[in-house]
Amino acid sequence: LGEVASFATELAEARLYENIIGRSAGFWEYLFPRMQQLCPSLAVGERETLFQSVNQVRPTLIRNNADELTYILHILIRYEVEKDLIRGTLSVAELPQVWRQKYTDYLGITPRNDREGVLQDIQWAAGYMGYFPGYLTSNLMAAQFAAALERELGPLRHLLAAGRFR
């Protein structure tokens, strides 16, 4: 009691708010007029521009900056690398080159250095091997949470646009 059931459950809640709610048209319908109150120079037509901006699909080097679609490819790269490390078919010395090649193959972009590449996450340094598939599981759970909310309360777009967050 008072604790989350798992890491994936905790992250699913975060992904629900970040991706399903925060990137939704209904949320931006609610938020934009409030943004205009704080920044009157925002034109009415800019709501759509902001909405499109937060939903733009564009490969990035850093997983935490990835859009909803390419985020999954970041997880797949990490899963494949971890699997090969654990199996012993990939050495630590080979990691940077394999990482760069997978980014080139999967995302069409290449890290310029290890900071943008294999060293960008703290999970391995903290001893969390096999951790990254939990991020994918959490995305699936967030989608299930959203579906359950809609079954119970109606379309999320309408609820969010009306500011019904409780």
For each predicted feature, which ranges?
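C-terminal, non-catalytic "cap/extension" segments appended to globular domains
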Residues: I75, Y79-R166
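A conserved active-site cap/scaffold subdomain adjacent to cofactor or substrate pockets
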Residues: G2-L90
